[in-house]
Structure formats: structure tokens, C-alpha cells
């Protein structure tokens, strides 16, 4: 028994164990794949909805709890992790182009939570079907497949996305030793940049984020950030000064991504109590599901521009964010420039199209082989006898019938 005891340094063993755990977390949960720009949980939600539940339109929507339960066979990390990932995939104020659609409460621009999964129903959005599922609706052969965590099922390693989703919808995740933070960008800008590189790979690319709620980007060197895939930038919400019959008020029309209006209101109330906003008379929320409208009514004679600057300085209406374009390429985490990422995306699309056209070619060749059989039957001059033999195949040996047809028509086993 004594000989089976191995002496190890607990500190070194802890380091090795943490390193293995951190790699597992990075590869299986947090870092988006370079090919489709999706994190594993996002991909698995779409796979569950498309393959298992077939909820691909409003007429085939299913309870979100059913989607979460089905996704567990691909993503064994708990209900909350899966359902929490569905929320930003469905909201216009968290994704530029939502991949799924809810038929009821999926959160709000104020920062409200989504309804319980047993109440909401969801399905893949039209954009999700066209640009994320893409060619998978025709054949599974367009992407590589791998075993699930328990080796009981298969799942795609990536989806055949038609547009660079990673740049369009952005992503944010914090894991051990890394922080992936990619802002949303305009669909038109990203497509224009991609087409430019398609026609001229030596072109220089500069992309500027386009916040979901149309905020203002302040004093940033986007040429440098685009070339490095890394850097800081300042973004601030839109505040309009409005005059009405009662005086002036400030209308907050947008907040930076992942900054919620409820938190802004709480901070403003705190500033009022601290006498840092003594010129404010009242705060009211006139927001709708489609438009944020926080109104800050000012006292008579107040300086609206001064109050505006106080809000930017003391609340999250103006924040500094980071770009860190890190992706999982095979088993390696890489930081890429915008151009490098788009060039890789184009290569991935070429591979998807090659596989698709190869599938279509094989399908056409098989069909041609079948048609050739019909032609030989017509040219044989003995159609009635051949049809009689086929109709009465139940009463004769199958091997004899196949051998007779092959000799009679000079056809192959496949035909």
C-alpha cells in the first residue's frame, strides 16, 4: 500500500488542475469560435430549436422550457445558463440582428428580466434561419460534426453562418485569464468590408461600432483598434434638450450597450439626494418597448447643458469600453485584427460552399444514374416483361431478380 502513494507538490498540482479547468471553460463555454462567431451555448440553442424541436417559425414555436431541456443534452451547464443565453439572442437592444424570437416578455430596455421559461415561447427568427442555420437546412455535410459530451449524440462544430455574426451582434464574456469584448457593428458596414476584402484582400479595413441603441462614439482611433483587434473607446448615450410649454427637460434616448435605464434612474436619484443635481425638478420614464425616453424635468432657469455634462460625468450614460477580438481557432485562442477575422470568415464560407456544391453534384450524379436506368428500360423493348418481374418480386428470390435485371439491362448494383 505504501508503494502506491505518490508524493506531489500541492501548489504545483493546484496550478495544473486550475490550468486544465480554465482551458475546459474557455473552449467549451466562453470563447466564440472563429468560424461562426458563436459561443457553444448559442450554437447549441439553435441546433436544439432547428434539429430537435423544429421551431423555425411562429407557427412552430415551442415553450422556452422545452428548448432549455432539449439543449441540456448538448450543453450540461444548467437551466439558468442556457435560458440566460437566450435573452440577448432575442432582444433588439442586445443584438443588432436577433437570432431567435420570443412571443412574450423577453426583458426590457429598462433592464427588466425575462419571464420564466415555462411562460415564454420562442422560435428561430427569419434572420437566424437564413444567416445562421443557412445551408444546414439542405444538408448536414456543409460543416464538421463531433460527439456530444457523453458520446450519445452528435452536434456541429460550427454553423454555416452567411455573415460575420461575431462583428454584427458582438459578444461579451469573462473567463479565467481572458476577457472577450466585441461591440456590435452595422450590418451594412460589415458586409461592405467583407465584400471589399473578397475583391481585394490587400485592402485596409476600418470599422466603427454601431451600438444597439444608437449611441455616440467619442474621440477614438478606430484605425488603430481595427488593425490590432484591441483597444479602448468611449461611448455615451443620446441626451436631447427639449423645450415645452412648462419649460425645459432632458430626454435620455439611448444608453450604452449593457447599461440599463433603471440603473441610470437610481443613480440620478442618488445624485439629487447628494445635492449634485439641484437643478432637477422631477424624473419620469416615458419609455416604450421600442424607444427609451427618460425625461429629466429642470427647474426654472436651470442650465440644461450643465446638467447634461453632470449626467455624463457621474452616471453610466458615458462609459469607457474595450475591444478585445479573441476567438477560438481549433484549440488555440487568438487575438485578430478586423481584417484578419474577415479574411478567415471568407475562407470558411468558401469551404462551406465547396461542401454544398459537392453534395449537390453527388445528388445530381445519383439522380442521373437513376434516369439512365429508366432510359435503358425504355430502350430494351421489353418493358412489359420487366414491369411484370418487378411487380411479382415478392414471389421470387430477390437475388435472382437483381441478377436478372443487371444482365437484362446491363446496369450496376446502385441502379
Language model features with spans:
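Short helix/loop capping segments that flank catalytic or ligand/cofactor-binding pockets
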Residues: 176, 183-185, 261-263, 304-306
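Short amphipathic beta-strand starts and helix->beta connectors
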Residues: 160-161, 230-240, 272-282, 370-372
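Long hydrophobic segments that form regular secondary structure
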Residues: 242-283
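Hydrophobic side chains in well-ordered alpha-helices
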Residues: 190, 264-267, 307
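Flexible hinge/switch segments at interdomain interfaces of large molecular machines
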Residues: 1, 18-20, 59-63, 97-103, ...
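Long, charged, helix-rich clamp/arm modules that form nucleic acid-engaging surfaces
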Residues: 1-11, 18, 23-31, 51-55, ...
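Extended, compositionally biased intrinsically disordered regions at domain boundaries
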Residues: 191-249, 262, 271, 352, ...
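Catalytic phosphate-handling regions of large nucleic-acid enzymes and associated NTPases
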Residues: 1-229, 293-295
